[in-house]
Amino acid sequence: MSEYSLFTSESVSEGHPDKIADQISDAVLDAIIAQDKHARVAVETLVKTGVAIVAGEVTTSAWVDLEQIVRDVICDIGYTSSDVGFDGATCGVMNIIGKQSPDINQGVDRAKPEDQGAGDQGLMFGYASNETDVLMPAPITFSHQLVQRQAEARKSGLLPWLRPDAKSQVTCRYEGGKVVGIDAVVLSTQHNPEVSYNDLREGVMELIVKHVLPAELLSKDTQFHINPTGQFIIGGPVGDCGLTGRKIIVDSYGGMARHGGGAFSGKDPSKVDRSAAYAGRYVAKNIVAAGLAERCEIQVSYAIGVAQPTSISLNTFGTGKISDDKIIKLVREVFDLRPYAITTMLDLLHPMYQETAAYGHFGRAPQTKTVGEDTFSTFTWEKTDRADALRSAAGL
């Protein structure tokens, strides 16, 4: 649901340089948290031609083979040859990780876990709307689906000339706040030198675009821009330097909601940039699922070393069944938004994060996953298990 008549969002594939960096950072986090659930982790990655640099601050009892983790991520994405532009088996890997500052640590750790302070100050937003079945904005949902399908077609051999790097962009048309059509589609995908442009365009249109986008939203007036420069052979870290945390709008709501500015990947749950943004999505989604509003955006803010949020604000954009002030009161009753309580509520101390680092952190289906002897649910912030409590408390 949008106030705009047209709204555009973009996504990028797992082979985009910034997403390579995000996935490496979260793979390192997962490897550490699998051994030490109470580790403090803040890992940043830079990838460029022939090299991956991993830096940050980590305090943990775990030992992980960082170089092998980096190589595995790069190879699993599909960068396995210099012909593609990057080779995980032969690239350089530089490790410049240090320990977390004791000044930060003393503000976070407490004798009573529930009194754990926020790892930093900041503001975070959560959002949900009823315009798609996953309660996400349509433009970002469709954009993610396009690049997910690109990776699927590449890895399965359906379109064997595809390479890992790709970007998508979808413009949706709204009337009365509802999606009534798709105005424009952009899909740029890396490819090998042998495929002709006509074959590429036909393959992408038939097996990616039309496979993903609802036919009823496409028309003779929809604009399709498939590799509009005509050629996209050089991609990945050769084409562009990749950095962790540089796709925060792709990671969240595609610009439909506000963003506090903090990135997610490479950060353990004590960092409210990540955990409170997940909690914000959980709260907003349950509000919409409960029928309290058709659209909801929530803001929470924190001070470093302080457990209680410094503020909780909410906007239902005139779609609420009860007042926003009453919904905020219900949020305070039903959800505990202190950092440790968020970690417990969403069961965040598991190696669940690499999967979030491509194709969006929100609008994803929770799945049961086992790593070693640890069985847990992924994407727990997408559950709507508090909708009934909200509905009941609201008297609806």
From Swiss-Prot:
Keyword list, A-Z: ATP-binding, Cytoplasm, Magnesium, Metal-binding, Nucleotide-binding, One-carbon metabolism, Potassium, Transferase
Region span, Flexible loop: 100-110
Binding-site residues, K(+): 44
One term of GO molecular function: ATP binding
Superkingdom assignment: Bacteria
SUPFAM superfamilies, per database record: S-adenosylmethionine synthetase
Subcellular location: Cytoplasm
Positions annotated to bind Mg(2+): 18
A single BP term in Gene Ontology: S-adenosylmethionine biosynthetic process
Record note on cofactor: Binds 2 divalent ions per subunit. Binds 1 potassium ion per subunit.
Main location: cytoplasm
Role: Catalyzes the formation of S-adenosylmethionine (AdoMet) from methionine and ATP. The overall synthetic reaction is composed of two sequential steps, AdoMet formation and the subsequent tripolyphosphate hydrolysis which occurs prior to release of AdoMet from the enzyme.
PANTHER family listed in its UniProt record: S-ADENOSYLMETHIONINE SYNTHETASE (PTHR11964)
Entry similarity comment: Belongs to the AdoMet synthase family.
NCBIfam families the record matches: metK (TIGR01034)
Name of the featured protein: S-adenosylmethionine synthase
Upper lineage: Bacteria, Pseudomonadati, Pseudomonadota, Gammaproteobacteria, Pseudomonadales
